[in-house]
UniProtKB/Swiss-Prot annotation:
Bias (Polar residues) ranges: 131-149, 269-290, 465-481
Gene, per the UniProt record: hbx2
Coiled-coil regions listed: 835-865
Designated name of the protein: Homeobox protein 2
Molecular function terms from GO: DNA-binding transcription factor activity, RNA polymerase II-specific; RNA polymerase II cis-regulatory region sequence-specific DNA binding
GO cellular component labels: nucleus
Main localisation: nucleus
DNA-binding region: 485-544
Gene disruption: observed consequences: No visible phenotype. Hbx2 and warA double mutants form fruiting bodies with an enlarged basal disk and lower portion of the stalk and the anterior of slugs is not as cylindrical as that of wild-type slugs.
Length: 942
């Protein structure tokens, strides 16, 4: 069986084992694979979801075959990103079988290790396959990696096999990745200095439960996929789908060695005590690391790399070109195209990949993912820069820093360490600007101009830079929010107060010229002088000592200088007493230097304000850029950068970003969300709910950063209008679920539970009627399925994070979800696991409360709904009487199985979803729930 047939079978929704990739690559089958992929990819979003599951599975399967490849591709495509994490041991031109079919079953912790009969252990994927094409033969041994007391992998050493064809001691298995052309630089894998840097795998154990170890599942794969995602995202945001397919195989956490190979081993060590991923210096070792190549043959990986490169070059055309070389790339490109057509469903997936990486960074579930995520974010930023050219590189810059911060990577780059971000300063080097041999990581978005992820890899975990916080407020002289400035404006110096008071005693209605003169002499603004006189007149009036004779018995307009001559000012002291201006001229000469200095300071403040305005236009301060739904949010959504690019193009939400301070999350959803500003609809209670859920949104943005599903969660964040925690169920489904909690009992909300996360953003429709609101919850598990594998635990994290925001139980749920995701992932060896994980993630959204909550709509609600209230509306709409919050909570606390089943509504299909068949998602799409709510039962969940 060749890879083409594997892809074909996987597109049919079959579970196929991830490491069939050792099969030989036959170029004649590429067309068939591309057709299958194209057909599947050209299906509906749900099909795309299923295909994404397949593509994601294919991407995942191919990623299983190509997860490493995607990562490798990212490494290769990123012009050999400094981190070539997943490098296949096979080249496309060679029919070399991968020496390792999969990681050892010891990836999972002892408490969760699969049984001998489980797919993870019994699958031939995990059986070592000798490499038949290397000149030196040897027995390959899979040695279980030691684990710490938490069940997490300790430092791992990986002995890398070196291809006899490699040069400069680089384990590049083929200098030419393209089967068709040996001279095509697009398909050429550089085996020189770009391959020098190593990604030092690591993950933070501080945030993980003893039983949870997302990294042990697909540490390398996730990283690689993230790298691919970065490349693809940077290129098309479509290729991200291809790249995004999470690696379905567990990371090679065990010591893999070849006996009698005579080849020096390449050691990959990851300290477990640090939270931010770090890159080894480019000079540290010239051997490229590709742990996933043991898992997945290098053919697909190289293909994905080509795709990434091609995608980076032509985005889509290159993908087609890559199709000749890459089954997965072609399909993925098609998927990406479909995704772009579908409001970038795949892009959302891509965003999920990036987001997953970002989320992983935040979740520290996959430090490698963190690295990849940073790469993705940076690449996305670069990608945004290329596409948007809206100073996105500046935004990206801030975003990268911001994402790193969000991702717990503390990648804060000081402006002194960052290059000039103007396009003219971008180095034409395909890898990154500056000296490639410099151990100091460089800002990578600058190289994104060439669609390079290397800088991202280099930037991933460099916490040594000086901390730069773009969120720092800029002092503005006219800003009422600045306390110091406010005090300075309102508290006058004694000399100023004396002069103004003396003038006021003579004339309480100075002319415009008088006020201008006072302002200039006192170093005050004209407005400040006018306000002072106005306040003084009001104070005088309150004291009752107003002299009506001076005003002719009528109230004089406060600041109407034009009517000065029309006032009865004949008795004005300034006029009758020779003018008050002389008072200033005759004032103490000692005041002049002080007043002049104040005046100079005033002018400096004005100039400073003007300059800062220009700087702020160039600098995208994330927390100030929410109003810019497309560009700034994308920048803010560095995690969403890929999605943001697509979403930014698609952003139709007027106010969502503003409503949800979820910069990243809102961007994805906002871009696709067509719903009007929720603050415009509903009662003041709904506004208060919005305020409450802005926190959720903020959490969502965190969730977004936390996991791939966060892109979905981003949608969820947008849709996490669901003021009721139970809506948060599904985290993903919540994406579309926007629930307004109005105090009107007649308000009805319809949830079209279409688990198309991608489609959700695209399909989110909200009626303007105050009575009924329809929510199309199109959270296709594409993103989730797409996230299957790498993204799965990310999704779990997202769901968990999401649930964490909503539920107090989130900690337990979070651990359960992550734990389950990892387990499901491990159980299914990746492909099925990805889907299952996605489903599990979507349903692990269980978070036990969230999914259950959501499932409350799906199942628990059904149980709780009186039969007299049931009716039909387009599909199965279920009317739900107001339930006590406690009852709803109980429903939410419903079984996770119910969540899975309820959420999919086609419970069985959910397993299929795990198989990569997004039937459940489709079913979910068909499921619509009508729910009546009141402030007492739903809205008031404090």
């Amino acid at each position: 069986m060749n890879i083409g047939s594997l892809l074909h079978s996987s597109m049919l929704g079959k579970q196929f084992q991830s490491n069939q990739s050792q099969q030989e690559v036959v170029s004649n089958n590429i067309a068939e694979c591309n057709e299958n992929n194209n057909n599947n990819n050209n299906n509906n979003n749900n099909n795309n979801n299923s295909n994404n599951n397949n593509n994601n599975n294919n991407n995942n399967n191919n990623n299983n075959n190509n997860n490493n490849n995607n990562n490798n591709d990212n490494n290769n495509n990123s012009n050999n990103n400094k981190i070539n994490i997943n490098e296949s041991s096979q080249s496309i031109t060679e029919t070399v079988r991968s020496p390792y079919s999969s990681p050892s079953s010891s990836i999972s912790s002892p408490s969760r290790s699969p049984s001998p009969n489980s797919p993870a252990s019994s699958s031939p994927i995990h059986s070592p396959i000798p490499n038949t094409n290397f000149k030196q033969s040897g027995e390959y041994q899979s040695i279980p990696s030691p684990q710490n007391i938490h069940g997490l992998n300790k430092k791992v050493k990986v002995d890398m096999l070196e291809s006899p064809n490699s040069s400069n001691s680089s384990p590049s298995f083929s200098s030419n990745m393209s089967p068709s052309s040996s001279n095509s630089p697009r398909h050429r894998s550089n085996s020189t200095s770009n391959n020098k840097s190593l990604l030092q795998y690591q993950f933070n154990q501080s945030n993980q439960s003893p039983s949870f170890s997302p990294l042990r599942n697909n540490k390398n794969n996730n990283n690689i996929n993230n790298n691919n995602n970065n490349n693809n995202n940077n290129n098309n945001n479509n290729n991200n789908n291809n790249n995004q397919s999470p690696s379905m195989n567990g990371s090679p956490s065990s010591n893999l060695s070849k006996s009698n190979s005579g080849i020096p081993p390449l050691q990959l060590q990851a300290p477990s005590n640090t939270s931010s991923p770090q890159l080894l210096s480019p000079n540290h070792n010239q051997q490229r690391i590709s742990p996933n190549r043991y898992l997945n043959g290098g053919n697909n990986n190289h293909n994905n790399n080509n795709n990434n490169n091609n995608n980076n070059n032509n985005n889509n055309n290159n993908n087609n070109n890559n199709n000749n070389n890459n089954h997965n790339n072609h399909n993925n490109n098609n998927n990406n195209n479909n995704n772009n057509n579908n409001n970038n469903n795949n892009n959302n997936n891509n965003n999920n990949n990036n987001n997953n990486n970002n989320n992983n960074n935040n979740n520290n579930n996959n430090n490698n993912n963190n690295n990849n995520i940073n790469n993705n974010n940076i690449n996305n930023n670069n990608h945004n820069y290329n596409h948007n050219q809206n100073h996105n590189h500046n935004h990206n810059y801030n975003n990268n820093n911001q994402n790193n911060q969000n991702n717990n990577n503390d990648d804060n780059f000081s402006p002194s360490h960052s290059p000039n971000l103007s396009p003219s300063n971008y180095n034409s080097s395909p890898t990154h600007y500056g000296n490639n041999n410099n151990d100091t990581p460089k800002r990578s978005h600058a190289s994104y101009k060439n669609n390079n992820n290397n800088n991202n890899n280099n930037n991933n975990s460099n916490s040594s830079f000086d901390e730069y916080q773009p969120q720092q407020k800029v002092s503005r002289s006219n800003s009422p929010n600045n306390d110091k400035e406010k005090k300075r404006r309102t508290r006058l110096k004694k000399e100023q107060a004396d002069i103004l008071k003396t003038f006021f005693d003579n004339d309480d209605y100075p002319t415009k010229d008088d006020k201008e003169t006072l302002a200039n002499r006192l170093g005050m603004s004209y407005c400040a002088v006018t306000t002072w006189f106005s306040n003084k007149r009001q104070e005088k009036k309150r004291r009752g000592d107003v002299a009506p004779v001076q005003t002719g018995g009528r109230r004089v307009p406060i600041d109407d200088e034009d009517d000065y001559e029309n006032r009865n000012g004949d008795n004005s002291p300034s006029r009758n007493q020779g003018g008050a201006i002389e008072l200033l001229k005759n004032s103490s000469s000692g005041l002049t230097p002080i007043l002049e200095s104040l005046n100079v300071k005033q002018q400096n403040n004005i100039n400073f304000f003007k300059n800062n305005n220009m700087d702020n236009n160039n600098k995208n301060v994330p927390h100030l850029s929410l109003s810019n739904n497309n560009n700034n949010n994308n920048n803010n959504n560095n995690n969403n950068n890929n999605n943001n690019n697509n979403n930014n193009n698609n952003n139709r939400n007027r106010n969502n970003n503003n409503i949800y301070n979820n910069n990243n999350n809102n961007n994805n959803n906002n871009s696709n969300n067509r719903g009007k500003n929720f603050s415009d609809s509903g009662s003041s209670d709904s506004d208060s709910e919005l305020n409450r859920h802005n926190n959720n949104n903020n959490n969502n943005s965190n969730n977004y950063n936390n996991g791939n599903s966060n892109s979905n969660n981003n949608r969820n964040n947008n849709n996490n209008y669901n003021y009721n925690n139970y809506i948060n169920n599904n985290n993903y489904n919540n994406n579309n679920n926007r629930q307004h909690c109005d105090d009107e009992e007649e308000d009805e909300q319809y949830f079209n539970n279409n688990n198309n996360n991608n489609n959700n953003n695209n399909n989110n429709r909200i009626s303007d009627s105050s009575d009924d609101q329809y929510f199309s919850d199109d959270t296709n598990n594409n993103n989730d399925n797409y996230n299957n594998g790498n993204n799965n635990y990310n999704n779990n994290n997202n769901n968990n994070n999401f649930n964490n925001n909503y539920m107090n139980n989130y900690n337990n749920n979070y651990n359960n979800n992550n734990y389950n995701n990892n387990n499901s992932y491990n159980n299914s060896n990746g492909n099925n696991n990805f889907n299952n994980n996605n489903n599990n993630n979507n349903q692990n959204n269980n978070n036990n409360n969230n999914n259950n909550q959501y499932n409350n709509n799906n199942k628990n609600y059904l149980n709780n709904i009186p039969s007299s209230k049931k009716h039909q509306l387009q599909g199965n709409y279920e009317r739900r009487n107001s339930l006590p919050n406690s009852q709803i909570q109980n429903n939410f606390n419903g079984d996770n199985n119910n969540n899975n089943n309820n959420k999919n509504n086609n419970n069985n299909n959910q397993n299929n979803n795990g198989n990569g068949n997004n039937n459940n998602n489709n079913n979910n799409d068909n499921n619509i729930y009508k729910r009546r709510h009141s402030m007492d039962d739903d809205c008031q969940q404090n």
